[in-house]
Amino acid sequence: MEPIRVIESRTVVLPRENVDTDQIIPARFLKVTDKKGLGKALFSDWRYAADGSPRPDFVLNRPEAQGCSILVAGDNFGCGSSREHAPWALVDAGVRAVISTRIADIFRNNALKNGLVPVVLDPASHAKLLAAPGASVRVDVEAQTVTLPDGSTAKFPIDGFARYCLLNGVDELGFLLAQDADIAAFEGGRR
């Protein structure tokens, strides 16, 4: 995992509320264990017609959405069943942060473990982002702030250990393995 300190990007806005993990990536795509390529299945039932052709009216298929790495979502994003494939698909599609007023706990934890920054903002700040699709936004993981299109900043909470892992580009196992010498010294002192 690469360290994530700051994400600067234009936003893509998906204002739908209660987007569950089955809408993020339908169950038929969960048979794989490789993260690569899952971005093509992201929001598949919304992005593609029955014949597989892209729906031009879906926000991620529009030319202005290309290259955007910050998704501004409606309230209660990532609800539903626990599937790690949901953040995998978002990251594989180039999304680095999801901003909402509420992000489901299980999705948030899976996102953090996979290098996707879940940002929960107050409703007023979130409304500014919903009203400005394509705006340039800055997510600062270190400062725990989002710089909004009008230049103001909004704070967001993030678990301290998860923040450490994002800033240092390690997952939980990588963190534990990096402590090997200290663990061995501690265990050696107990004998």
From Swiss-Prot:
Reaction it catalyzes: (2R,3S)-3-isopropylmalate = (2S)-2-isopropylmalate
Molecular function per GO: 3-isopropylmalate dehydratase activity
One Gene Ontology biological process: L-leucine biosynthetic process
A GO cellular component annotation in the UniProt record: 3-isopropylmalate dehydratase complex
Alphabetical list of SUPFAM superfamilies matching this protein: LeuD/IlvD-like (SSF52016)
Principal EC category: lyase
Role summary: Catalyzes the isomerization between 2-isopropylmalate and 3-isopropylmalate, via the formation of 2-isopropylmaleate.
Organism: Anaeromyxobacter dehalogenans (strain 2CP-C)
EC code: 4.2.1.33
Gene3D superfamilies: Aconitase, domain 4 (3.20.19.10)
Entry's family note: Belongs to the LeuD family. LeuD type 1 subfamily.
NCBIfam families per UniProt: leuD, PRK01641.1
Protein name, per record: 3-isopropylmalate dehydratase small subunit
Record pathway: Amino-acid biosynthesis; L-leucine biosynthesis; L-leucine from 3-methyl-2-oxobutanoate: step 2/4
